[in-house]
Amino acid sequence: ILVWLFDVYLWKMKLVQSMIKMPNLDGTYKGKLTRQNDGKSELQERDITLTVSQTWLTMSLVFEGERSQSTAKMILMSVQDPKHIVLNWIYDCKDYTGLEDENLYGEGTTELKLRLSNGKRKLQGHYYSSKLRHGHLDLEQIS
């Protein structure tokens, strides 16, 4: 019972946070994805949502765009100190549309750095996909 209490609740308390140095990224982040298809010079911008579900022992990431959803297969959080927090993950991407001519399935990798701006948490970084796409992500925590 003590492990469960710590895993789900206690580690999020400010006093405990100051001792364990594990950042709590739990919440919903909204923002923009700016991408470039390989070989093309035009940039595309899309609205995106990242949902982070975190306990002391586990973390899951679900990334949603207008036409697809990505789920993290492997996640790494690097915490050098409270000002240098990096989140890396490998993901599978699935199509929302159901259209046969869309090629929205794939895999990829993402790296985001946590930044504080005007008291708000931001996750910013890059992604690369097996569909020869790459781009920049700029997200802000909304809950």
Give the location of each predicted region.
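Amphipathic/hydrophobic helical signal segments and adjacent flexible N-terminal regions
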Residues: 1-28, 34-38, 143
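Charged, amphipathic alpha-helical segments
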Residues: 14-15, 44-45, 106-109
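Tryptophan-anchored aromatic micro-motifs
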Residues: 23-44, 63-65, 123-129
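N-terminal glycine/threonine-rich, aromatic-flanked beta-hairpin/loop signature
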Residues: 41-77
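Short, solvent-exposed coil/turn segments at beta-strand boundaries
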Residues: 51-58, 80-84, 114-122
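Edge beta-strand at a domain terminus
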Residues: 107-143
